[in-house]
Amino acid sequence: MPRAPKRQRCMPEEDLQSQSETQGLEGAQAPLAVEEDASSSTSTSSSFPSSFPSSSSSSSSSCYPLIPSTPEEVSADDETPNPPQSAQIACSSPSVVASLPLDQSDEGSSSQKEESPSTLQVLPDSESLPRSEIDEKVTDLVQFLLFKYQMKEPITKAEILESVIRNYEDHFPLLFSEASECMLLVFGIDVKEVDPTGHSFVLVTSLGLTYDGMLSDVQSMPKTGILILILSIVFIEGYCTPEEVIWEALNMMGLYDGMEHLIYGEPRKLLTQDWVQENYLEYRQVPGSDPARYEFLWGPRAHAEIRKMSLLKFLAKVNGSDPRSFPLWYEEALKDEEERAQDRIATTDDTTAMASASSSATGSFSYPE
């Protein structure tokens, strides 16, 4: 992998442009490819909407074609809310995040990924199923997980086996693992096991973010995945990234300035208005630039919500390595953890002092006889 960029803060325009050109995102593969004329098919699921279709497409990637049907294809007597309408989506591995120049040393190159939930510990040989069949079932499962997230409902292994991948129990670890990976990389949704005995799971936004970009209706799709991608790029660039670098990454995902996307809407609005208003990003003119050039920085909400160690673990997981493989960022993440711990201690001390003062004041007060 290319060497990691130097961790420099916001620099003069000339230096920043030079660094951006040498770093780039060479070799990155697009995690999303959008096709406007996606076809639809019928799902075999019995307990989630018929508009969650199976895909007949074959892929060797880790995330699969998701081809929701149009609302008109859902039967009128189906009382379950329709899932969102979207174009065909394909997620290839490695993703843009996985292709970022993260390598800072040769150490830790053989590090293993973090352990998965107990349900996923043993993955069967995928050769026992055709790749196209795996793709189809993972697609069904991702659609099911998205619906459950939209409905804010937990899920169980038994429910998945009954509703989505019936007759595939032996392959549940493989299918569930790949569907969970797709949920994380594309939509920024973590599938967390909350009961190892009963194999029950909840779906939550990754990295502790309190934003998913969804509207009030169930037609909306979570946008946390693309937000994490942008914040990751800004992080490894030193919290200050030229606008051109961001658009380069988005273009590889099939997102273009001024072109409406069926899931994300108009990308420029998302970047420069929605996320700026949500305080996840700052968008400003590069000082002294003429003609004007712009750059992105982390906003106050990103700094408040995202632990750098969590983000580094996310990037390491995507790259199949260990956070210690990136000593420069790991050192910064440790510093962030220490600062947060000190803030918690200070807050606790202040609360204790206030409670003590209040108690003393109450105890010294006496009623007149």
Curated annotation (Swiss-Prot):
Compositionally biased residues, Low complexity: 39-62, 348-369
Polar residues bias spans: 85-96, 107-121
SMART domains linked to this entry: MAGE, MAGE_N
GO MF annotation list: histone deacetylase binding
GO biological process, one term: negative regulation of transcription by RNA polymerase II
Domain MAGE: 134-333
GO cellular component: cytosol; nucleoplasm; nucleus
Its biological purpose: Not known, though may play a role in embryonal development and tumor transformation or aspects of tumor progression.
Name of the molecule in the record: Melanoma-associated antigen 10
Organism: Homo sapiens
Taxon lineage: Eukaryota, Metazoa, Chordata, Craniata, Vertebrata
